[in-house]
Swiss-Prot record:
GO terms for biological process: hydrogen peroxide catabolic process. The keyword Oxidoreductase does not apply. This is Hemoglobin subunit alpha. Involved in oxygen transport from gills to the various peripheral tissues. The N-terminus is blocked. Belongs to the globin family. Red blood cells. Keywords: Heme, Iron, Metal-binding, Oxygen transport, Transport. GO terms for cellular component: blood microparticle; haptoglobin-hemoglobin complex; hemoglobin complex. The keyword Phosphoprotein does not apply. It comes from Dissostichus eleginoides. The gene is hba.
Amino acid sequence: AAVVALWGKIGKSADVIGNDALSRMIVVYPETKTYFSHWPDLAPGSPHIKAHGKKVMGGIALAVTKIDDLKAGLFDLSEQHAYKLRVDPSNFKILNHCILVVISIMFPKEFTPEAHVSLDKFLSGVALALAERYK
């Protein structure tokens, strides 16, 4: 309930959150650039970063609607990341951390300790669900 309530407050800013989180991940964790080497511009806020950040947050929005069964709800995304994109699942945790940082900066009033723990637990569940097809 806490995640759904928080998402209701921050969801309209999902595109900005996604752009900022992905930009932050690529700068702070440069080893993650390898997955985006086919993009001509990896600068923070570049068109590809913005578009993929929007896509990532679309996946998070989907996960919010599937919160009661993340494994089933994110099955297709797990398949895509495991078999097509071949993303190392440890990167999900890195991006989750960047998402938390951005939300804490953008929404300090809403990002209470209780919201923090709820969102962290939810994003960890999303990461586990996305890693499901790697087994």
